[in-house]
């Protein structure tokens, strides 16, 4: 096989059918839309979710819950992630440099999944009790900001 011998698979490249350009084309007059009716009209068609008059799914299902306006999204880091990063100091700046978070506005929470084998100094927004104990056990410092 050579680059100059590459060909498209037969049938994969078909020309778009041009409709409404005269009877001789075979796709003139109604231009494949049929006669009359909502879908034959300009701008015709049904709205998304319309089920032909049957009560649509979004109205059959109950309204549940709400989205809190004060919700805070935390970037979750586990002890195993800190081990993988291999940094001595974990804070917003070091995580931005490692491309874990995008900016200082990100909130960070550390959880205790995995194990940690080396000393790490941590400066984060939230930390679980188990993660805090694991870091301090190895001689690291934990600062909640």
From Swiss-Prot:
The family database entries (PROSITE patterns) matched by this protein are listed as: RIBOSOMAL_L15
Q: Where is the composition biased (Gly residues)?
A: 42-52
Q: Name one Pfam family in it.
A: Ribosomal_L27A
Q: Does the keyword Ribonucleoprotein apply?
A: yes
Keyword terms of this UniProt record = Ribonucleoprotein, Ribosomal protein, RNA-binding, rRNA-binding
> From what superkingdom does this record's organism come?
Bacteria
Listed SUPFAM superfamilies: Ribosomal proteins L15p and L18e (SSF52080)
Which biological process annotations from GO are given for this protein?
translation
- Cellular component aspect of the GO annotation: cytosolic large ribosomal subunit
Give positions of region: Disordered.
20-54
One GO molecular function term of this record is: rRNA binding
Q: What does this protein do?
A: Binds to the 23S rRNA.
Similarity section: Belongs to the universal ribosomal protein uL15 family.
* HAMAP family xrefs: Ribosomal_uL15
Q: How is the subunit organization of this protein annotated in UniProt?
A: Part of the 50S ribosomal subunit.
How is this protein named in the record?
Answer: Large ribosomal subunit protein uL15
Please spell out the taxonomic lineage of the organism that makes this protein. Answer: Bacteria, Bacillati, Mycoplasmatota, Mollicutes, Mycoplasmataceae
What gene is it encoded by?
A: rplO
